[in-house]
UniProtKB/Swiss-Prot annotation:
Residues 31-50 bind DNA. HAMAP family: HTH_type_BetI. One of its GO terms (molecular function) is transcription cis-regulatory region binding. SUPFAM superfamilies: Homeodomain-like, Tetracyclin repressor-like, C-terminal domain. InterPro entries: BetI_C, DNA-bd_HTH_TetR-type_CS, Homeodomain-like_sf, HTH-type_TetR-like_transc_reg, HTH_TetR, Tet_transcr_reg_TetR-rel_C_sf, Tscrpt_rep_BetI. The gene is betI. Repressor involved in the biosynthesis of the osmoprotectant glycine betaine. It represses transcription of the choline transporter BetT and the genes of BetAB involved in the synthesis of glycine betaine. GO terms for biological process: glycine betaine biosynthetic process from choline; negative regulation of DNA-templated transcription. This is HTH-type transcriptional regulator BetI. Residues 8-68 form the HTH tetR-type domain. Pfam families: TetR_C_6, TetR_N.
């Protein structure tokens, strides 16, 4: 009889091994066997929990996305009700420590690439994109006309993705302070009174 709670412990162990495998070997070098080896268990157990490599990547991305959504919720809850503060909180969540480690950044890049080919991953990407846009648009709409709020949300989302992508590809630790300053300056420009 399996131990109570062992399923979640095992899944977390395998997701961590997947993150490490993608970090060290990339997505092409990540196999059920390489994940099993890193987790020190049999390939059959990996297959039992996730089915195949796509299932493993999906579960890993769901984990990373839950961390992102938790960071967003936590940072928004700590911010004042002012739209500027709440927008900055959403931006900061995207550069949270849970999102900028080398294993997570490489997994994001692999996920984005695979989401163009795998319907389940594409759906996860769309949910994430819509959630970000919705969060940004809701805050911008508190001070900007609706059409302008949508444009501002699209622009800030693109800036977040661009800063994050450049940071991920830089080959060195992401300069979160510089990224946050650029994004926050952009927010300030968008919310500045128009003459």
């Amino acid at each position: 009889m399996p131990k109570l709670g062992m399923r979640e412990i095992r899944r977390a162990q395998l997701i961590d091994a997947t993150l490490r495998s993608i970090d060290e070997a990339g997505l092409p070098g990540t196999t059920l066997a390489s994940v099993a080896q890193r987790a020190n268990i049999s390939t059959g157990i990996v297959s039992h929990y996730f089915g195949d490599k796509d299932g493993l990547l999906e579960a890993t991305m769901r984990h990373v996305l839950r961390d992102l959504w938790a960071a967003t919720t936590r940072r928004r809850a700590a911010a004042s009700d002012a739209p500027r503060a709440r927008l900055r909180a959403v931006v900061a969540a995207n550069f949270d420590d849970t999102q900028i480690s080398a294993p997570v950044m490489k997994t994001w890049l692999a996920f984005w690439s695979q989401s163009m080919h795998e319907p389940t991953l594409r759906r996860l990407q769309r949910v994430n994109t819509r959630r970000l846009h919705s969060n940004l648009c809701a805050e911008f709409a508190k001070t900007l006309p609706r059409a302008r709020a949508r444009e501002a949300a699209s622009g800030l989302a693109a800036l977040i993705d661009g800063l994050w992508l450049r940071g991920a590809l830089a080959g060195k630790p992401l300069d979160t302070k510089a990224a946050l300053k650029l994004a926050n300056d952009y927010i300030d420009q968008l919310l500045a009174p128009r003459v």
